[in-house]
Amino acid sequence: MQEHLVVTLDGKDYLVEPGTNLLEFIKSQDTFVPSICYNESMGPIQTCDTCTVEIDGKIERSCSTVIDRPMTVNTVNNDVKDAQKEALDRILEKHMLYCTVCDYNNGDCEIHNTMDAWGLQHQTYEYKEKPYEKDYGPFYRYDPNQCILCGRCVEACQDIELNETIRIDWDREHPRVIWDNDVPINESSCVSCGQCATVCPCNAMMEVNMEGNAGYMTDTEPGSLAAMIDLTKKAEPGYGPLFAISDSEAEMRKERIKKTKTVCTYCGVGCSFEVWTKDREILKVQPSHDSPANKIATCVKGKFSWGHINSDQRLTKPLVRKNGEFHEVEWDEALNVIADNFTSIKEKHGPDALSFISSSKATNEESYLMQKLARQVIGTNNVDNCSRYCQAPATKGLFRTVGHGGDSGSIEDLEKAAMSVLIGTNTAEAHPVIASRMKRAQKLFGQKIHVFDIRKHEMAERADRFYQPKPGTDLAWLSAVTKYIIDHDLHDKAFIEEWVEDFDEYYKSLETFTMAFAEEATGIPEAELIKFAEECAKAESVVICWAMGITQQDIGSDSSTAISNLLLVTGNYRRPGTGAYPLRGHNNVQGCSDIGSMPDKITGYQSIEADDIRAKFEKEYGVKLNPKAGKDNHEMVEGIHDGQIHSLYLYGEDTGIVDSNINFVQAAFEKLDFMVVQDEFLTFTATYADVVLPASPSLEKDGTFTNTERRIQRLYQALKPLGDSKPDWKIFQAIANKLSFDWNYKHPSEIMDEIARLTPLYAGVSYERLEGFNSLQWPVHPDGTDEPILYLEGFNFDNGKAKLFPLSFDNYFKQDEVYDIHVNNGRLLEHFHEGNMTYQTPMLKYKVPRAFVEISPELAEDRGIHEGAEVKLISETGEAVLQVHVTDRVKGKEIYIPLNNDAMENGDLGAINLLTNSDVDQYTDTPSYKRTSCRMEVITKRGKSPLNPNNFRVNKKRHPQYSVQVQKKWERPDYVFPGNQVDK
């Protein structure tokens, strides 16, 4: 095979690797070629024709040319320049240049920059207005009269995000971008990911918040704006002066528009991007090709849900309860109240009478200081975080089998896999950017997707095969599939021999897991499971993703273990496109656990009960540490009821809504002697507190987050804290110092340096190595090298071998005669968790105003109810009143309740956890949220739908196609390739 090819570029020879994109190669040599429709994250679209060059004497598009032979390329001769000018003129026929008074004139308009760099002075074809008005969606708008039909938005929607809503209607007299079958944006299947606005090269597709806000002269009335445009064009005889003026105005904007790199504060994908702010106003969020987890992708929350930052419900002063009511006080008074109460409770009841709950929304550095406050200052290990509610069982299963509690590869590996298996994960709504990667791999590259879930969500609809097991029975089919693979000699014997131990004992434990047994337990036909087993064993590479549908069961740890067992038996670790992916739910739930906010583990999962580990931290902290493991979240609540816990300090966590059996939890709060809540808002939980401290959200501080793929990323402060609110790390430091300790951190980087000193998993992490969009995936070695794929040098056990873990199953699902309905629950795309942050963005509240219950058509018919009916759901622990949405996403007596009940407005009204019980996974104390049953009472039989009629779930269908279908443009009678117009 030839290693390099000779490419002669403008008279100079280069050695180039075969398969290189010609346009990318030309750019790499600092040679300018216009390329308006090309985007490095999307590849060639071939609509603009501006990138024409001469290849071996023929004018061709460089963007779609792959270097597969020696070639001679010319970018500067007259024929090339004539072809390029023709293409540029055609663009200006569709797009009016009024840069100085355009909101997009911020230095990154690709039409402006291309025309300027090319040196275009006059356009040949007069601009032609099109017979269309602007179309406004909730978050972005489309201006057909500025659209050049480059098709980037179509490519992004169809083949990057895979929402499959946008296309270009090439058959019109005046082609334009349309949504679905030509409906307004707000009536379409659009999910508002915003990627169309991200990739648009001009002002045709733009964020609503930008319009009238970005420029010095763009906030005028439309008529005045048009007059200014005409005046500007008349005053400037050539584009050179126009560009000079607009460039000066763009430079002025830099003084007031700040662009700050940050990391999304919602789910665990870890999307990074620049946030554009003007004073405190958030204009837009702009991801980058350099964003390591997401590239140019976003979801509706990361792109648009920032209303919480400037919400009028933000806390700006500390609150102290006096005579039963909250009063605003200065910081010193609030800190004194906390210090006095902590001291008196510790003196009276001992340090273990105090407890601390850390936040998965806060930074690594802040989570570290919370556990340090508990352990060093107070002397207790009663510290935990919300991974207890969701991810602890997955971590347990991985610790048992492979030794690290995190994703075994990167998000890229989810794209590379030949087969993806999704179990108990509503990925398209809970981790939408990850789902897009998988949807793309399936659509464009043939990845096979298998989904096991009790509910038919989007990924189930798209799956090559969809299986619906009975609730809580996944362990049965996982183990039966593994047994079948071994029984039929389909297991990876070489991998097992070299890298796995305990095979014989494990195989014996599978004796009862026959396919017949699995069919009886799960309801999945034996033939389907056999076919799956054979496909899984024979696939070149397999990844398994799972989430709360697995972990929030009373056998969550064992089911997670069964997943890893299957991967080991089939040899699906230690290679690209393979491995275990417990998709983390919060932006920093991985990091919060990594960094030691756990009752039995300090940083890097080092045991607090190990003498040598404690000795290391005692030397750093200057105190003796408590050698006894503390209480987890579940045990804290029980400890309050039992009189063992007298104080609770939690931050960034609405425990009174999100914990299971919240009637029991709220009753515990009322028994506390002293409670501190630290948050952006006066949350439902905060209403029980004695002191409420105003905390700053992510845009108001520096720090790091660790995402689901173990990726550590920096976020930078974009705004000053609102009012007297403070970053959490500063609050913890102030409390520690009030309690006579001498914490003196000047910046979160100093906290990370301390973490790195104490934590082998983070040993090489530093802010310098995380500068900008740089990132590291733990374990990070002292020299700064990291491990995007785990276990390449062996598994995380002393002998380097993984361990197969024997399991048993007796967790049969049984329908209760009284509580005859099974209650499933989870996230919606538009909201996050209880919705405290997302409901502060009005258009998200408009899309999904309140919580509701999904009911199957057959259950609705059985109970005589219709869309919008009001029902009371009653379980053994409580009751909730909700409106009904009838949908075939659920079947039979399965119902689904989203987590978001807008608790700050509604309290616990309609909260799912009024129905859940206190049962837990025996190994991790994770509540079995998904193991809930209820009965139903009908209040009204029909009513107004709980969903906005413009919500994409309401009778909206996707319209998939491949790319922009540029061949339809080329087939139009009015199209001629510019290269063919060049007079030879």
UniProtKB/Swiss-Prot annotation:
Binding site for [4Fe-4S] cluster 2: 147, 150, 153, 200
Annotated NCBIfam families: Fdh-alpha
UniProt family annotation: In the C-terminal section; belongs to the prokaryotic molybdopterin-containing oxidoreductase family.
UniProt keyword Coiled coil present: no
Cofactor(s) essential for the protein: [2Fe-2S] cluster; [4Fe-4S] cluster; Mo-bis(molybdopterin guanine dinucleotide)
Binding sites annotated in the UniProt record for [4Fe-4S] cluster 1: 95, 99, 102, 109
A GO molecular function held by the record: metal ion binding
Reactions catalysed: formate + NAD(+) = CO2 + NADH
UniProt keyword annotation of Coiled coil present: no
Cofactor binding note from Swiss-Prot or TrEMBL: Binds 1 [2Fe-2S] cluster.
Protein name: Putative formate dehydrogenase SAR2393
EC number(s) per entry: 1.17.1.9
Binding site for [4Fe-4S] cluster 4: 264, 267, 271, 299
Keywords, in A-Z order: 2Fe-2S, 4Fe-4S, Iron, Iron-sulfur, Metal-binding, Molybdenum, NAD, Oxidoreductase, Repeat
4Fe-4S ferredoxin-type domain mapped to chain residues: 138-165, 181-211
SUPFAM superfamilies: 2Fe-2S ferredoxin-like, 4Fe-4S ferredoxins, ADC-like, Formate dehydrogenase/DMSO reductase, domains 1-3
Positions of the UniProt region annotated as Formate dehydrogenase: 252-984
Residues that hold [2Fe-2S] cluster according to the record: 37, 48, 51, 63
